[in-house]
Amino acid sequence: ICVGGVVFEDEQRVSDGSAARDARAPVISSRPAALLHAAGGAAAVELAESEDVRAWLAGEGPAFAVGDAATDTDLERVAALWHAHPDVLLAGTAATIGAAAGAVAGVGASPRSPRPHVEGPVLVVCGSLHPAARAQVDALVAAGALAVSPGDDPGAAVAALRAGRHVVLASGRPNGDAIAPADAVATSQALAALAFQLEAAVRVPTVIVIGGDTAAAVLGDQPVEVGGTVAPGVAWCRPSGETEALVLTKPGGFGSPSALIVLIAAKMSP
């Protein structure tokens, strides 16, 4: 949520939580306006009330604005105001974009693409080092999935997938607090290469990719058909090319430890 221009997660400023210890891109401020300024943007105004948002959209104030939102109703309110000003670029979390889509499509609109059926076995590819992501893959392995790393012999993973067992392909866990950008890219590419090798050896109906760098490496620059979400923060798409796999992507710092188990169990139900 964002209150007074400050972003909180679990009632804690994000700069005081696990996001501040992210190995790839640690959060250094809980104020988006400050981050915009640090990135070279012009001054940004923080908007607390609907009237503030309405006035800014009408042209009063600097080029950037950060609006408060603590509930879904707040997001819907901001999205409705924004919808009347299509010249303004709206950016935010998946929930923000979802509210914007609702404002554009209208209340009760049906999705253009039906929600897909998640067929097993599932290959999970995780390059994120966020504690939330690691807790999720650990829970799935504890529930019976096979854990493999880029340096492992893929034979065991192929055999597991052929037997209908879920496989978790995850990067190692370095001892240092920070990861160099080049190392992060190399790790993501290694994960993607092994994932491609597994998909070439055995039919993998569903691939779940955790982490932005990992998703970029797995999806590459091929066109993809993005259909929507299967759960909060979890998007689904179907890449073009030889594979027919359903690909789900999710951020590393999102969800409870049981998120993968619940996602797979719920969506594999008839």
Locations of regions flagged by a protein language model:
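Cap/lid and interdomain-hinge subdomains that line or gate substrate/regulatory clefts
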Residues: I1-R77, W82, P270
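Active-site histidine-anchored catalytic micro-motif
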Residues: I1-S30, V204-P205, V209-L263
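General beta-strand structural signal in soluble alpha/beta enzymes
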Residues: A43-E49, A65-A69, L89-T93, G98-A99, ...
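Residue-level preference for the first positions of well-ordered beta-strands
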Residues: P62-V66, D87-L89, P121-L123, G164-V168, ...
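Catalytic cores of soluble, metal-dependent hydrolases
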Residues: A80, R173-G228, G241, A265-M268
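Short, flexible loop segments at boundaries between secondary-structure elements
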Residues: T93-G120, T229-G253
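Redox- and metal-dependent alpha/beta enzyme cores, enriched for Fe-S-associated oxidoreductases
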Residues: R112-A190, L194-F196
